[in-house]
Amino acid sequence: MSNSLVLVINSGSSSLKFALIDTVSGEATLNGIGECFGLADANVSWKIDGKKHEFQLSDNGNHHKQAIDRIVALLEEQGIKQDIVAVGHRVVHGGEKFTQTVKIDETVLQEIENLSDLAPLHNPAHVVGMRAAIAAFPALSQYAVFDTAFHQTMPAKAFTGAISSKLYDDYGIRRYGFHGTSHYFVSREAAKVINKPIEKSSFISVHLGNGASVCAIKDGQSVDTSMGFTPLSGLMMGTRCGDLDPGIIEFLLKKGWSTEQVFKELNSNSGFLGVSGLTSDCRGVIEAMEEGHAGATLAFEIFTYRVAKYIASYMVALDELDGIIFTGGIGENSLPIRRQILKSLKIFGYREDEVANADARFGKGGVITQANTPIAMVIPTNEEWVIAKESMALLHA
């Protein structure tokens, strides 16, 4: 059995995703998810050889620990637990403290927890998952890989807000950016597509999913990105509003809304869901648009317009542009979304290759623009592979 297996864990407040990655092939030996933590129907499901299995968790305790325990049992049943050499954890927010992958110890756990003010929905849940994994795999080295780390190369003009420097000095208020592992991975894969060294390339990476962000990447490094202090800013998303005049927050507070109500509205009831009035799922919005639903049509138009606008604005961060990269669940699979974004960029010479664009879906990538026109391409992301590779590299450092 391979000695290159890394267990990758992404622990959220009410869920826990996991995958067993072979760092040589990049393939997931198995993957699954624990869902509905804190509810009566909490469960863990996984796929092996294309077949889905499910296990109901009990309602009498810590669902993160129960999920990890079930994963351990699953690995033992498959006879592969002993072949795992490390555990890698996704961490949403590393602030300015963590600029690269680190080995997890008690000090690191405390520092991640101390950053919870910057990611209150994510970092505490990461620590819960890490502690459960450490208890389950005490002999294995475990590593934290940060979404924000890739963006620590942004220049001050890109990450600094036009506010008093005291707010940055006292509270660390600045642009941090997210989806870093995804932007990192697809930019390296895109450089291979155009046969150019990553150190001499320039891309605009467009990660579109329920969460979405754009990143300008110069010579392999992030130089600007659309998400900011939190993952709420930037593009319109599944349930998040994206960029919004902050004066609206004061307006709603004066109208009697509580702070919690305002931010629940902006985080959970906006985006595709809020504008369409139907769903946060892009596929459902497009289906309704095709049936003539006005709210769905407007949601589609706002989303694609804002993505194109961000892409255009990030051209000024680069000396040249080798390609636009579409990735993430929507970016990899939604033909109508990509088509409309490219139409919006026609002033820059982008022309869709309809056959190639239709073909680049469901795990298949490639260039989707016509020959002799600026390049746009689809690159399926693989964040788990990045986390596994980063963990393996540090293990052998």
Swiss-Prot record:
The pathway where this protein functions is: Metabolic intermediate biosynthesis; acetyl-CoA biosynthesis; acetyl-CoA from acetate: step 1/2
Residues that coordinate or bind substrate: 90
Q: Give the record's keywords alphabetically.
A: ATP-binding, Cytoplasm, Kinase, Magnesium, Metal-binding, Nucleotide-binding, Transferase
At which positions is ATP bound? 17, 207-211, 281-283, 329-333
Q: What is its EC number?
A: 2.7.2.1
Q: Where in the cell is it found?
A: Cytoplasm
Q: How is the cofactor bound?
A: Mg(2+). Can also accept Mn(2+).
Molecular functions per Gene Ontology = acetate kinase activity; ATP binding; magnesium ion binding
Q: Where does Mg(2+) bind?
A: 10, 383
Task: Please tell me one Gene Ontology term that the record gives under cellular component.
Answer: cytosol
Q: Which GO terms describe its biological process?
A: acetate metabolic process; acetyl-CoA biosynthetic process
The top EC class, named as a word, is transferase
Cofactor names from the entry are: Mg(2+); Mn(2+)
Q: Catalytic activity, per the record?
A: acetate + ATP = acetyl phosphate + ADP
Recorded hits in SUPFAM superfamilies, A to Z, give:
Actin-like ATPase domain
UniProt xrefs under InterPro entries: Ac/propionate_kinase, Aliphatic_acid_kin_short-chain, Aliphatic_acid_kinase_CS, ATPase_NBD
Q: Matching HAMAP family, A to Z?
A: Acetate_kinase
Q: How does it assemble?
A: Homodimer.
State the similarity comment. Belongs to the acetokinase family.
Tell me, what does this protein do in biology? Catalyzes the formation of acetyl phosphate from acetate and ATP. Can also catalyze the reverse reaction.
Spell out the protein name for this chain.
Acetate kinase 2
